[in-house]
Amino acid sequence: PGAEAKELFRPRVGFNVQSQVTDTLSVAAQYFFNWQSFDNQAYRYPESGTYLSVGDPLLWAGESFIVARSPFAALPGSPDYLRAWRGKDIEPDDNSGNYGLALRWSPLWADATFGAYYRRTYDMQFQLMLTPGLATTVPAATCTAIGGQPLGGTNCIINKQVTDLSLLRSKGKAGEYNAAFGEDIDMFGLSLSKQVLGVSLGAELSYRQNMPLVSEAVQVLPAPLVNRSRGQIATTEVPKSGTPGALGDTMHGIVNLLGIVGTTPLWDTATWGTELTWMTVLDVTQNEAVYKGRDNNKYLPYNLLDRPDDNFFGLAVNFTPTWFQVLPGVDMLAPMTWSAGVAGNSAVTFGGNEDGGTWSAGIAADVRQRVRFDLKYVAFFGDYTKCPRKGSPPTGFCPTGAMDVNNGVTAAISDRDFVALTIKTTF
C-alpha cells in the first residue's frame, strides 16, 4: 500500500523512442524483447513458504499439491496422499511481441493532454492447466481402449506421460499441473490529464481483446474422455504457447484526482489523492466453461464467493500531512492509504474483489531531501468462507475452520499484518 510506481517495475530489456512532431503533438513507441530476455517477465510474488505467500504450489518454488487420498496408502513405503507435480510452464511465444505506440496531444485551447495508445502484450499472470495421470471412474475396457493401464475396478492410469504405477505407489504422483501465460493481448486506450480548480485530474479508458479471465484449472485428458461442457481439452490440444483458459474482451476505466491542502493548525501542508477503477467483461471468446463468471444455465454452475460480477468498482485513497523542519533539515510526514473493492468482483486476476483491500498508516522523516525513513503498519482485509463447504462433510483436505474460498488475495492474507521500515535515498 502506498508504493510508488518506480518501486514496483522491474527492469526489462527493450527500447523506447519519442518524437515531438509539433509543439502540441508527440509520438512514442516501445518494444520489449522476448520473454526470456531478462529471466522472464512474469510478475513476482512473495514466494512459496514466505509470510505473504498466497498459494505455495503455484509460485516458482511450488512443487506439488494434494489431490486425493492414495489407494496405495496401506502399502509399506507408500505416501498417504496422491499429488499433482509441477510441470513445465507454458510461456508466451517469443515472437508474439510486446510493443506499443502512443500519441499525445496538448492543444492550448483545452489546457489538457489527450492520449491515444495501442499495446500488443502478453499476460504477466498465469492460468492453471491440470493433467491427471490417474482416473478412478474409467472402466477397464475403456481404459484399455484409450491405451491406459487398468488398475482394478474403475481405476486407470489414463496418461502414461505424467505418471506410472511405480510413481503412483512410491511417490504418490497422480498427474501434473502447469502455469500457462496468455499472449497476443491487444489493448486500445485513451487518456486525459488536466488541472481543474487546482486539482490534477487523470482519466483512462481501455479496451482489451484476448484478455485472460479468472478461470478454474483446465483439465487435459485423452480425447475419448474429454467433456467440452467442462472446458476440458485433449492431450493433443495442449498449446505450445498461450493459455487454454478463458479469454475475453474487457473494458477498463480509471479516474484519479490529486490535490494539496494548505497550512492548517494541524499541519503545514498535506497532499491527497483518490482513484476510482472500473472494469467489465464485454464478451467471453474462449473456453467459457472454465470462466468463474460463466453462464450457469449453459455450464456447470459456479456460485462460490469469488465468482466475478458483470462490473467491478474499486476505490483507493491516500492522505499525507507534512510538518516542515521539526528538526534542522528534517521534515516529518504521516502517510496513510486505503484501497478496496467497493462493488463486485473483477473478472481479471488481481483486478480487485468486493470488500477486499489493504490499508496502511505510518510516519516518515525526510532528511535534507536526500534520505527518507518510513515506518508503517500494513494490514489486509477481505471475505472468505471456511470449511466444511455448505452441503459437504468435513474432509482431511479441508478440516473444519480452515479457509475454503478466499475472495481475492488480500482475503487470503488478512491475518498477516506487518510493520515495515523502509530507508531510501537518491544518488
What name fits each language-model region?
Residues 9-13, 95-99, 184-188, 249-253, ...:
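Residues that define the transmembrane beta-barrel architecture of outer-membrane proteins
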Residues 244-347:
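C-terminal structural cap/anchor segments
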Residues 24-28, 40, 106-113, 262-272, ...:
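Short loop/turn motifs that connect adjacent beta-strands in outer-membrane beta-barrel proteins
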Residues 15-19, 101-105, 116, 190-194, ...:
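Residues on the lipid-exposed face of transmembrane beta-strands in outer-membrane beta-barrel proteins
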Residues 1-56, 314, 343, 352-357, ...:
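Outer membrane beta-barrel
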Residues 31-37, 107-109, 118-124, 196-198, ...:
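Transmembrane beta-strands of outer-membrane beta-barrel pores
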Residues 1, 41-86, 126-177, 215-243, ...:
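Solvent-exposed loop segments that connect transmembrane elements
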Residues 370, 411-427:
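Outer-membrane beta-barrel "beta-signal"
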